[in-house]
């Protein structure tokens, strides 16, 4: 398992554990606590995870995914800029 996969796995596990359990008297389904979801991620890691999930159409509300799928990520733009100089 690569480091990105293992960190992604840990994040998904954390999100699963963040789900509020349903008690017999509670109305509606279990929901993620919006205050804690994806705010713990650092910029670089969030960029990698969100880029992957946006391409698959997952986690749009957490990642602020662009509408276009062929948008070049900031990471690639930085790499191209540094090679051009």
Swiss-Prot record:
One of its GO terms (molecular function) is toxin activity. It comes from the Eukaryota. Residues 1-24 form the signal peptide. The keyword Signal applies. Keywords: Amidation, Cleavage on pair of basic residues, Disulfide bond, Gamma-carboxyglutamic acid, Neurotoxin, Secreted, Signal, Toxin. Contains 2 disulfide bonds. The keyword Transmembrane helix does not apply. The modification 4-carboxyglutamate is found at residue 47. Residues 25-38, 68-85 form a propeptide. It is found in: Secreted. Coiled coil: none annotated. Expressed by the venom duct. GO terms for cellular component: extracellular region. The modification Aspartic acid 1-amide is found at residue 67. Belongs to the conotoxin J superfamily. The cysteine framework is XIV (C-C-C-C). Causes scratching in mice. This is Scratcher peptide.
